[in-house]
Design a protein with these regions (language model features):
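Mid-domain catalytic core of redox enzymes
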Residues: 2-135
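C-terminal catalytic lobe of FAD-dependent flavoproteins
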Residues: 121-184
Length: 184
C-alpha cells in the first residue's frame, strides 16, 4: 500500500499497482519506520512522536554451511552463538552471532546449516547459501518508553500497529502483539 489517506471513518489507500481501495481499518504489521514511510504526510504528530522513536540498524546476514563461523569446540555449540563483535578498538560495530539452525529449528539434515549476522569475515564463498541485509531494532530508553505509548495509538483513525519491536524483538512477541490487535 502506498499513499494512504485517512478520513473520519475510512482509510483510502492507493495500492502499489495503482488500484484504489477503501478500508475501515489498517493494521501495520511492519517496522515502525516502514509504517511512518507508508503513512507519509498523513502521519499524525502523535504517531511520529511515538513510533518515530524506533531506530534500526542493518545486519549483514548469511545463510551458510561454514563451521569456521562457529565456536571452535563443537561441544560449545548452541542454538545461538555469540562470537563477538566485528569492531576495532574505539569503533562501534554490530554484534557477530551465528545461529545453528539444525538445533534451533530441529532440522533433520545431514549438513549443519547456520545463519550468521555481521561476521568479521564472511563465510567461505562456496559455503554461502544466501546473503541478505536485515534491519533490527535498536532499543534505547526512548524506544522502551514509546513501547508503552503505542497502545494510545491503537484504533485511532482506524490504524493499528504490531510487531516484534513492541517487545523484545522476537517473532513470538510479534505474534502476541498481532493477536492483541485483533482482540481490540
Amino acid at each position: 500500500m502506498t499513499d494512504p489517506v485517512t478520513g473520519a471513518d475510512v482509510i483510502t489507500a492507493v495500492e502499489t499497482n495503482g488500484a484504489v481501495s477503501v478500508y475501515d481499518n489498517v493494521v501495520f504489521a511492519c517496522h515502525p519506520d516502514q509504517a511512518l514511510e507508508i503513512l507519509g504526510v498523513d502521519a499524525t504528530q502523535k504517531e511520529k512522536d511515538v513510533i518515530g522513536c524506533f531506530k534500526y540498524s542493518p545486519n549483514n546476514t548469511y545463510v551458510h554451511t561454514d563451521k569456521a563461523l562457529m565456536p571452535k569446540a563443537k561441544s560449545a555449540w548452541t542454538s545461538w552463538n555469540y562470537i563477538g563483535n566485528s569492531k576495532a578498538v574505539g569503533e562501534e560495530k554490530p554484534v557477530f552471532v551465528t545461529y545453528w539452525l539444525n538445533k534451533l529449528q530441529k532440522l533433520n539434515h545431514p549438513t549443519d546449516i547456520f545463519v550468521s549476522l555481521n561476521p568479521s569475515t564472511p563465510p567461505a564463498a562456496d559455503k554461502i547459501l544466501q546473503k541478505m541485509v536485515y534491519t533490527h531494532p535498536q532499543y534505547t530508553q526512548d524506544s522502551v518508553r514509546a513501547q508503552k505509548k503505542v497502545v494510545e495509538l491503537q484504533g485511532d483513525r482506524g490504524t493499528y500497529f504490531c510487531g516484534a519491536w513492541m517487545g523484545y524483538g522476537f517473532h513470538e512477541v510479534s505474534y502476541l502483539n498481532t493477536f492483541r490487535v485483533f482482540l481490540i
